[in-house]
């Protein structure tokens, strides 16, 4: 953040009187209109307070949330395109599609070229990631597959650059979803991937990161780079998190898999307690920012929530298993239907682990 005027300042921040602040705890820079805020979203007292108390004016389930996002961007000049396969056949260096921008990246030698079917566009891209498999089912927010809302633009006569991107994302939250303006916080960052990178603004509500607007303009890495011939807007947001924010359920799994998990809970004879789950998973979310060891996160959340051994064994542990099973089944369905198979080699090994 050595040059915030060059990399992070956008017109919206002047129009809405956002102030740039440094987090009192971690020193990260962020933008807010809340004059009383002293910490970034990761270290605020209201972190994950939307659980049990959603801050949006409307309630949308998983499907409805996408329809709201899609209608907003289409209304604002974007073309909605269908998702690409989760099996990334157009990239030799990737087994699976890990982000929406991957749909449009073409690697030619040492150069990355972007091919957009429309400009600007929005895409509901299913992505597969296996880095945090041990967290799935336990944390309330980790998935092995998820839908990334991709907002992409090339800043030419048809598209746009930073100012309009951030303005659209802000209006999506405040107008389409009814979030109070004071709840929206933008955090400065840099995003690197696929051989290109740029400054980025992550946007949060109640401590939940909903999306990350990346202003891709460099090729290489932070130690050795050059300017790209083509600038790219690469905003990726989690659809699951948008639905979760509006529903305020104990976990993101509840609003994404609700009818399925409810049926499995009934079949298993598990009687859940919403008040208990809201308390427990709020503690889990907060402790994730403090501890890197998942077992420590879980142990501290159990202690903070005051759970008994009986509640852990009869409610929490079985519930974690159901969440994991439903998540893994969804991932396998996407992967197999798009042409991948569980195996002992390559990306198929990840699927084999999940199936087992």
Predicted features, each with a name:
Residues 50-352:
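Structured aminoacyl-transfer and RNA-binding surfaces used for tRNA recognition/handling
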Residues 20-23, 27, 36-37:
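Residues immediately within or flanking Cys/His clusters that coordinate Zn2+
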Residues 2-16:
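Short, intrinsically disordered linker segments that flank or connect zinc-binding domains
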Residues 355:
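Aromatic-lined, polymer-binding surfaces characteristic
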Residues 33-47:
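Cysteine-rich micro-motifs
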Residues 18-20, 200:
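Short, acidic/polar N-cap/turn motifs at the starts of alpha helices
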């Amino acid at each position: 953040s050595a040059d915030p005027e060059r990399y992070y300042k956008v017109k919206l921040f002047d129009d809405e009187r956002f102030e740039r602040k440094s987090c009192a705890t971690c020193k990260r820079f962020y933008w807010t209109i809340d004059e009383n805020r002293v910490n970034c979203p990761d270290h605020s007292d209201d972190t994950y307070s939307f659980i049990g108390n959603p801050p949006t004016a409307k309630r949308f389930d998983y499907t409805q949330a996408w329809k709201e996002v899609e209608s907003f961007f289409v209304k604002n000049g974007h073309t909605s395109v269908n998702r690409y396969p989760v099996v990334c056949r157009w990239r030799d260096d990737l087994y699976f599609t890990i982000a929406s921008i991957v749909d449009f990246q073409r690697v030619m030698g040492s150069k990355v070229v972007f091919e957009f079917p429309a400009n600007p566009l929005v895409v509901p891209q299913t992505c597969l990631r296996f880095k945090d498999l041990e967290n799935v089912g336990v944390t309330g927010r980790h998935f092995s597959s998820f839908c990334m809302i991709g907002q992409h633009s090339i800043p030419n006569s048809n598209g746009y650059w930073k100012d309009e991107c951030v303005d659209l994302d802000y209006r999506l939250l405040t107008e389409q979803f009814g979030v109070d303006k004071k709840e929206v916080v933008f955090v400065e960052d840099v995003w690197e991937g696929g051989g290109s990178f740029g400054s980025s603004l992550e946007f949060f509500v109640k401590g939940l990161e909903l999306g990350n607007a990346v202003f891709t303009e460099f090729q290489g890495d932070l130690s050795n780079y050059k300017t790209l011939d083509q600038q790219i807007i690469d905003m990726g947001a989690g659809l699951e998190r948008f639905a979760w924010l509006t529903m305020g359920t104990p976990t993101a799994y509840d609003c994404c898999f609700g009818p399925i998990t409810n049926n499995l809970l009934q079949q298993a004879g598990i009687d859940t307690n919403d008040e208990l789950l809201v308390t427990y998973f709020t503690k889990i979310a907060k402790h994730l920012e403090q501890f890197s060891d998942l077992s420590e996160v879980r142990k501290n959340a159990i202690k903070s929530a005051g759970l008994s051994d009986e509640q852990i064994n009869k409610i929490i542990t079985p519930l974690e298993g159901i969440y994991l099973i439903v998540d893994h089944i969804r991932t396998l369905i996407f992967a197999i239907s798009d042409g991948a198979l569980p195996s002992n080699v390559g990306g198929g090994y990840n699927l084999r682990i999940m199936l087992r």
